[in-house]
């Protein structure tokens, strides 16, 4: 069963934004953001026990951050400083993977990557596998946002959410003893059906990311990320009525077979036409000869 393609949004002229996205690939935008942020190293301040952080940037950096689809802009009265609220996965990705921001604690002390990892793990036990899934998609130039409103962990966009609708509802499934009782998601048939129906009702394909370890590792350090492996699986529902009523395009062999049948029928029809015409002419000739006699 073929997966549905991207659903591009349309501008005022009625044309979709596919060409605009192709001219501005997300990989180039993220590279531009990294180059801009490395020189100034903007500071993200942890905002509370939930794990989110607030990042302050200048006007030009705010434009790049918005184009790269990191965080959500916070409205404020000052035009010189722009603030963005970042999720734990976004904070650690900008700090660890891109190495382009600095993170301070609530008491304004700079945090190391290990301290930041421990902080996010204390807020959410599932942070290691969630971050691994987030980074896996981001490194493939997908835009990743929270999928809680769709009954998933994340949703994945082909480009900026202003240009295209999200294609995938992402569910993260950890496997292995190191993940403890967090294993076993979607193993019950009813859970899988619920996830499929929830994603299908909002025109998204269910993408299951299974996180496992290539060797025994400790999740207490970000070094474990190199040993975690991601397996991608898309799951779709086969709807009998829909498949029966949909008209499928015939294959090339079927088209050639139909053309051959039509040619044969045409030859047979022409053959019988010749015989019928000859019979009629013969009858007329015999009739005229009898009439003259």
Curated annotation (Swiss-Prot):
Gene Ontology MF term list: lyase activity; nucleic acid binding; tRNA-intron endonuclease activity
InterPro entries in the record: tRNA_endonuc-like_dom_sf, tRNA_intron_Endo_cat-like_sf, tRNA_intron_Endonuc_cat-like, tRNA_intron_Endonuc_N, tRNA_splic
GO cellular component labels: cytoplasm; membrane; tRNA-intron endonuclease complex
Record's catalysed reaction(s): pretRNA = a 3'-half-tRNA molecule with a 5'-OH end + a 5'-half-tRNA molecule with a 2',3'-cyclic phosphate end + an intron with a 2',3'-cyclic phosphate and a 5'-hydroxyl terminus
EC numbers for this chain: 4.6.1.16
SUPFAM superfamilies per record: tRNA-intron endonuclease catalytic domain-like
Chief subcellular location: nucleus
A GO BP annotation: tRNA-type intron splice site recognition and cleavage
Enzymatic class: lyase
Keywords from the UniProt entry: Lyase, Membrane, mRNA processing, Nucleus, Transmembrane, Transmembrane helix, tRNA processing
Bilayer topology: Single-pass membrane protein
Subcellular location: Nucleus; Membrane
Transmembrane segments: 267-287
Active-site feature positions: 157, 165, 204
Family statement: Belongs to the tRNA-intron endonuclease family.
Role of this protein: Constitutes one of the two catalytic subunit of the tRNA-splicing endonuclease complex, a complex responsible for identification and cleavage of the splice sites in pre-tRNA. It cleaves pre-tRNA at the 5'- and 3'-splice sites to release the intron. The products are an intron and two tRNA half-molecules bearing 2',3'-cyclic phosphate and 5'-OH termini. There are no conserved sequences at the splice sites, but the intron is invariably located at the same site in the gene, placing the splice sites an invariant distance from the constant structural features of the tRNA body.
Subunit structure: tRNA splicing endonuclease is a heterotetramer composed of SEN2, SEN15, SEN34/LENG5 and SEN54.
Identification of the protein by name: Probable tRNA-splicing endonuclease subunit Sen2
Protein source organism: Oryza sativa subsp. japonica (Rice)
